Amino acid sequence: MKKNLTFKELIFVASMLFGMFFGAGNLIFPIFMGQLAGHHVWAASAGFLITGVGLPLLGVAALGVSQKDGLLELSSQIGRKYGVFFTCLLYLTIGPFFAIPRCATVSFTVGIEPFISDGGKMAGLGIFSFVFFAVVLFFSLKPGQILTWIGKILNPLFLILLSTFVIRALFSPAGNMSKIEASGAYVSGAFSTGLLEGYNTMDALAGLAFGIIVVNVIRSLDIKESGAVAKNTIKAGVFSSLLMALIYVLVAVVGAQSRGVFPVAANGGETFAIVSEYYFGKPGQIILALIFAVACLKTAIGLVTSCGETFEKIFPNGPSYRVWAVIFSLLSFL
């Protein structure tokens, strides 16, 4: 039994955690913030990082420092009934009631919908959602492989695709960011508005939810002692947070620079679409579709897995993990 993850293991666990955190909303919010903030992008980004990165890190660290197995055990220190109520409410909110369905709709809206005629969009969304959640369920039924699926395959693929977009944009800026005027609330309150936008990613809640997966994965890597699990959980959280912060800032800068050519878009998804087409032409839509599909897929897998593992613990005499995974996938599809 060892005390510390190897550097390679730590990187893969951090990659897995980052992959679960970083979904479509984490792309849409910063690029749109950058467009609106203009030359105030640095102040806006500072606020965004406090709530969009700092709070999720605190959530992961809280589980690590407390040396608890998950949110249920942590919140049950107030009382068992409260712990069950709070845990169920949080997981259902960031799971099948909101965040998981959004993974399918956002990836469809940004990546697939532009290729479909108006008359076929509803049917297209239904078919896409069915396939999307079938894939999510396939990966979620094997929670012991989540480090491989997300940390070693899906997240590296996502980072390669996103890096292609970001590097191209940064090395050929569409405009001089320092000359772009701020818009809306960013004119006089860039920092505070960025603070709110970072909170809107909902990762503050996800930090508590994903902790159980990180703890289980670290234990599967032959680290069993509670203190060692806690220390390595925090290490993985720090590595993941640093990567999140870097990408948030770079994507926000791309958004700010885009104002040199384009007016403020209706939303972050539209911003990504026009910037992608500007740099890559029509193939840019395919790149964009892949970026959002992979981003949403890995987050949905993480959410279904964490919901299934948690509800199996809450109701030890109830359905098995695999049944819970099916239930949450079906609820999200419907």
Positions of the model-derived regions?
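Hydrophobic, small-residue-rich membrane helices and short re-entrant helix-turn-helix hairpins
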Residues: 142-153, 191, 214-243, 260-273, ...
